[in-house]
Amino acid sequence: MKKIEGYVVRRLEDEYLVLPSGRRTEEVNEVISLSETAGFIYMHAERAENVYELTQLVAEEYEIEPAEILEDVRNVVLTLQKKGILL
């Protein structure tokens, strides 16, 4: 999985803010707020080839069975793709 270039991430307590930077600010004027778990998924997306590998990373981090969170991880990935910050 690959993050789209032109964004910076700022962590504020238990949420992540994804902000456009550089030229991206001319195209996008939206700040994307992510929960702690969605932020973890976004920050670690490039370590995974697919949703299944990403689910495994989340499962290890939060000590949850992968089968319990697969659908949730898939939904977060789809949302990040629709927002244009993840391929």
Over which residues does each language-model region extend?
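Acidic, low-complexity/disordered tracts enriched in E/D and polar residues
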Residues: 1-43
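Long, charge-rich, low-complexity alpha-helical segments
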Residues: 30-87
